[in-house]
């Protein structure tokens, strides 16, 4: 506590705080830090809650150096306020001490269905519940959380933290329907028929992209999201080690250089891979991953092949991948690998919109929405937000 207060006291409490401008959800950063500096933990948490329903999560996975912290006026001098750590401290303190007891309005403003319980769905559900709406989340998995639960590794985002944040959403009166696949078991029309006044689609981008090159169908070429999902449920004790698609001693390549690629590479290290190499067609400067994750990967022994554009995956006579061929600054080269993970992006699955009339999407399947009323689709009463609307970004961008 004393360390957190001391760090908070370094804040200059700027008149025009650039840190707030750097936050996609415009969190009241100087205000919560000011309360923390005085030891007013409850006030600090209440201020954070005004903008964020998932502070303990954002504090752990946000790219702070690109957002709030990177915009701090002290950052160029190497002395930027550790905003993420302060938010994490306050959120964890609140979880442990249960400081906040919100007075909730009666649920009299209508009935809203939220599809998906990732960052976007949880944020919308929490906000609406606080405003007096009766909210139900339809979730396809056995446990809520979406990408927070199944797509981000335990070492970066402990699942207990996710569960605690979801419990806070439940405490607002939000109901969860689990193992409920919208677009398969029921569609948008069915949900409206159940008496819902509005529907929010926050289903994210569940469909991973592949590479249109020879050998993409070889055995041993897998999606990074699948590796992360299986590793997460293995860590939970739900499946055995044999279900995780990286075998101890394998030489693993990861295609791509975003945060998912870093997560997959570091997970492969933890699964006992003999070597892990990230293959990226651009330079280190072009890398979209968070710098802290890149540095952590380096420290864990992950290697990097820059400006290496893969043209073919190589296989043996049994259809098993054995390596790749790529164009490099030194010419065409071949590299031997036992396993190749694809982390080259994802896009929305069509299951929800294809089973419902009147919801327009672009050519890539992203749901088209209006500015006014904000987030409304081409179908009246149906709204959408998060990664299903824009290309996959960070947790906090999905919340925005």
Model-predicted regions and their roles:
Residues 134-137, 141-172, 176, 265-312:
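Rossmann-like dinucleotide-binding cores of NAD(P)H-dependent redox enzymes
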């Amino acid at each position: 506590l004393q360390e957190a207060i001391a760090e908070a006291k370094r804040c200059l409490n700027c008149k025009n705080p650039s840190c707030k401008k750097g936050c996609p959800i415009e969190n009241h950063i100087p205000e919560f830090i000011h309360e923390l500096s005085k030891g007013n933990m409850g006030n600090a948490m209440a201020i954070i809650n005004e903008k964020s329903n998932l502070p303990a999560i954002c504090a752990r996975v946000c790219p702070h150096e690109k957002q709030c912290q990177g915009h701090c006026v002290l950052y160029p001098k190497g002395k930027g306020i550790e905003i993420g750590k302060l938010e994490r401290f306050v959120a964890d303190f609140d979880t442990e001490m249960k400081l906040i007891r919100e007075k909730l309005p009666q649920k009299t403003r209508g009935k809203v269905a939220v599809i998906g319980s990732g960052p976007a769905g949880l944020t919308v559900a929490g906000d609406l519940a606080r405003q007096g709406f009766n909210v139900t989340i339809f979730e396809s998995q056995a446990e809520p959380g979406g990408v927070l639960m199944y797509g981000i590794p335990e070492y970066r985002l402990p699942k207990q933290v996710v569960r605690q944040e979801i419990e806070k959403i439940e405490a607002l009166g939000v109901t969860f329907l689990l193992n409920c696949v919208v677009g398969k078991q029921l569609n948008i029309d069915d949900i409206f028929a159940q008496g819902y006044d509005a529907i929010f689609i926050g289903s994210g981008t569940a469909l991973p992209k592949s590479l249109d090159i020879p050998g993409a169908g070889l055995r041993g070429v897998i999606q990074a999201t699948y590796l992360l999902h299986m590793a997460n449920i293995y860590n939970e004790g739900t499946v055995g080690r044999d279900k995780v698609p990286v075998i101890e001693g394998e030489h693993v390549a990861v295609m791509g250089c975003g945060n998912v690629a870093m997560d997959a590479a570091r997970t492969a290290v933890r699964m006992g891979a003999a070597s892990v190499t990230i293959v990226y067609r651009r330079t280190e400067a072009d890398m979209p991953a968070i710098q802290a994750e890149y540095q952590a990967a380096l420290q864990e022994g992950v290697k990097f092949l820059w400006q290496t554009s893969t043209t073919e995956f190589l296989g043996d006579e049994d259809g098993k991948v054995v390596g790749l061929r790529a164009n490099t600054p030194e010419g065409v080269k071949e590299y031997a690998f036992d396993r190749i993970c694809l982390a080259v992006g994802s896009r929305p699955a069509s299951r929800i919109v294809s089973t419902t009339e009147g919801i327009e999407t672009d050519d890539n399947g992203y749901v088209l929405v209006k500015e006014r009323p904000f987030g409304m689709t081409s179908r009246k009463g149906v709204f959408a937000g998060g990664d299903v609307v824009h290309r996959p970004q960070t947790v906090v961008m999905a919340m925005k």
